[in-house]
């Protein structure tokens, strides 16, 4: 099926339509790359501006960045534990900030003003490829965390506390990235769909509270993704006695 | 896509979200009830309880979202469209 039959120019929603870029044998979704590069650029600019001319008493952007740093450190420390959290804080922080900026950037920036030949610009996290990539990164990260910290003793975790747990723990390794990616993808796409359907039914005022709800849930989803990534890493580096 | 496949896909998409919303709905009700009870007993812990509640809400909600993902696949990227 093609795009939904929406008549309003700014409420069009094209699910499953993409702007394809051909690179070698690969077909990539160009609109996702464009938005994510823009948002990554904005994030980098914010950090560069905030860390230039640092002062003892933080003000403005530096203050915001220090608040974020504190927030991410607390998140990582409660999930991973005092010993290992320092190594993983950059990873968790990057995940959190990228997902948060993607979700909000997709909702707050008026992308509809830029017209593409096919597909539409929007949150990079509303594309399943982005979220699967992030989730697989988390899988790699927790395997690496466990193996580098404990060596082959990492596999004790699979038979802890009893060997009966072995099949469940192996299945878990596959369900973790699956649920991580689907949760994020589904939530962000659902927010966009709900707003689009409401705008189609009642174009004025009524969609606004739903948009705020969407902003709220997408912030929570960024927090959940980061928290779960930290929790999985913490589970892998935890010592059993 | 022939009409039987279309009809079956649309019905299945509706059922996927509708049935998938039952369990999380009950779960969220129980969780919210527990949180209200906790706040009533210990009003000073409200901030902490609210944070945990929202986080667990999002987990429950994602179960319905899995149903929604199935529904969206059936509607927009149907593998049986042929």
Swiss-Prot record, chain B:
It is found in: Cellular thylakoid membrane. It is a multi-pass membrane protein. F-type ATPases have 2 components, F(1) - the catalytic core - and F(0) - the membrane proton channel. F(1) has five subunits: alpha(3), beta(3), gamma(1), delta(1), epsilon(1). F(0) has four main subunits: a(1), b(1), b'(1) and c(10-14). The alpha and beta chains form an alternating ring which encloses part of the gamma chain. F(1) is attached to F(0) by a central stalk formed by the gamma and epsilon chains, while a peripheral stalk is formed by the delta, b and b' chains. Keywords: ATP synthesis, CF(0), Hydrogen ion transport, Ion transport, Lipid-binding, Membrane, Thylakoid, Transmembrane, Transmembrane helix, Transport. The record marks 61 as: Reversibly protonated during proton transport. F(1)F(0) ATP synthase produces ATP from ADP in the presence of a proton or sodium gradient. F-type ATPases consist of two structural domains, F(1) containing the extramembraneous catalytic core and F(0) containing the membrane proton channel, linked together by a central stalk and a peripheral stalk. During catalysis, ATP synthesis in the catalytic domain of F(1) is coupled via a rotary mechanism of the central stalk subunits to proton translocation. GO terms for cellular component: plasma membrane-derived thylakoid membrane; proton-transporting ATP synthase complex; proton-transporting two-sector ATPase complex, proton-transporting domain. GO terms for molecular function: lipid binding; proton-transporting ATP synthase activity, rotational mechanism. The gene is atpE. It holds the Pfam family ATP-synt_C. PROSITE patterns: ATPASE_C. This is ATP synthase subunit c.
């Amino acid at each position: 099926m093609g795009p939904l039959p929406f008549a309003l120019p700014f409420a069009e929603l094209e699910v499953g339509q993409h702007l394809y870029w051909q690179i070698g044998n690969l077909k990539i979704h160009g609109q996702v790359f464009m938005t994510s590069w823009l948002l990554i650029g904005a994030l980098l600019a914010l950090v560069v501006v905030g860390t230039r001319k640092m002062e003892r008493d933080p003000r403005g952007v530096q203050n915001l960045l220090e608040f974020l740093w504190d927030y991410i450190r607390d998140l990582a420390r409660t999930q991973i534990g005092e010993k290992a959290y320092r190594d993983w804080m950059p990873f968790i922080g990057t995940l959190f900030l990228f997902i948060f900026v993607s979700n909000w950037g997709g909702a707050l920036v008026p992308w509809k003003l830029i017209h593409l030949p096919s597909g539409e610009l929007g949150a990079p996290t509303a594309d399943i490829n982005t979220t699967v990539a992030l989730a697989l990164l988390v899988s790699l990260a927790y395997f690496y965390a466990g193996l580098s910290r404990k060596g082959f003793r990492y596999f004790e975790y699979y038979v802890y506390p009893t060997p009966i747990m072995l099949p469940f723990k192996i299945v878990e390794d596959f369900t973790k990235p699956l649920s991580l990616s689907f949760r994020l993808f589904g939530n962000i796409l659902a927010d966009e769909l709900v707003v689009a359907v409401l705008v189609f039914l009642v174009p004025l005022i009524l969609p606004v509270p739903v948009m705020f709800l969407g902003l709220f849930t997408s912030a929570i989803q960024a927090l959940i993704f980061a928290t779960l990534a930290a929790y999985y890493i913490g589970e892998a580096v935890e010592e059993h006695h | 896509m022939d009409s039987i496949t279309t009809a079956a896909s649309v019905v299945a998409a509706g059922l996927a979200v509708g049935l998938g919303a039952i369990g999380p709905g009950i779960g969220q009700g129980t969780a919210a009830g527990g949180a209200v009870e906790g706040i009533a007993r210990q009003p000073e812990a409200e901030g902490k309880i609210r944070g945990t509640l929202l986080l667990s809400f999002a987990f429950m909600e994602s179960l319905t979202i899995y149903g929604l993902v199935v529904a969206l696949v059936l509607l927009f990227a149907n593998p049986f469209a042929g």
